[in-house]
Amino acid sequence: MTAICSLFAFSSCGESKDDKIYVITNAFFAPFEYYKGSEIVGVDVDIMNKVGEKLGKKVVIENADFGVIIESVKNGEKYDCGAAGLTVTESRKEQVDFSDAYFTSVQYVIYKADDEGMKAKLKTAADGKTKCVYWSDLAGKTLGVQIDTTGNIYANLEINGEGKEGDPDYYKGELNGTGATVKTYDDAMIAVNAIPSGCDVVVVDQLPATYICSKNTQYECAALYYDENTATEEQYAICVAKGKTELLNAINDVLKELGKDGIDALVKKHLGLEG
């Protein structure tokens, strides 16, 4: 009976959708969202729970494939917002509204710790401390990615380029013509576990990469740069269905209250770096 009430919460069990905030996520993107036992936890979950407290509503977090998050929030039939380490892009902004950005990330590459070929390509970025490899160093490799993520988008862009040669906005791509390919997986950890039989390396955002490598010492990771000064910078935000102004304002209020220090504290908490 409990399971039935959970599935049909909108029409039964005495609670309406107005009493809750339904949040869709993909719970395989630690430290932002991940399973702890049967519970979904993470930075985004902590943020949304604070939003629920502000609005006096219960927050319900549900897991789904990453690729359906934007569309599910856009149609507004069930989910009020999406919190999944979502990168703000122009195409996504056409479909949903985004909160203020709360975290800046770059793309990373994960490889086997005993991959001497990759280790030989390691460099130090212009800041003097960031370990990196260049996109061009991935020539000829099979790049594993989580489907529909920005890692997937960037990998496709660098392999296939954009526009037509001769056009003013033409971009060849760092890996175009090198024999590099993309292989998609349902989540980053599945992709990582496929190294080296299914793919050579995995392209994923910074903190999920460092989290995975901290828990699995047979892998290492490095930032992906174009040259010593230029990385693939992107910003995370929470998305809501267009027109949900009250919810969007509450999310922005919470993000403002947390500030950079508060977000950093949540990140450290879920990376196990507290204390």
Regions found by a protein language model. Give the residues of each.
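Sec-dependent signal peptide cleavage junction
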Residues: 5-19
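Extracytoplasmic small-molecule ligand-binding "clamshell" domains
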Residues: 17-86, 183-185, 205
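Periplasmic-binding protein-like
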Residues: 26-27, 103-111, 206, 210-255, ...
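Short, solvent-exposed loop/beta-turn-alpha elements that line the ligand-binding surface or hinge
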Residues: 32-46, 117-123, 136, 173
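Hydrophobic residues within well-ordered alpha-helices
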Residues: 51, 73-74, 138, 192-196, ...
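Ligand-binding clefts/hinges and TM-proximal coupling segments of bilobed small-molecule sensing domains
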Residues: 58, 125-140, 145-172, 176-182, ...
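Acidic, polar ligand-binding/catalytic clefts
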Residues: 58-137, 223-231
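A ligand-binding cleft/hinge motif common to bilobed small-molecule-binding domains
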Residues: 67-71, 85-95, 154-157, 161-163, ...
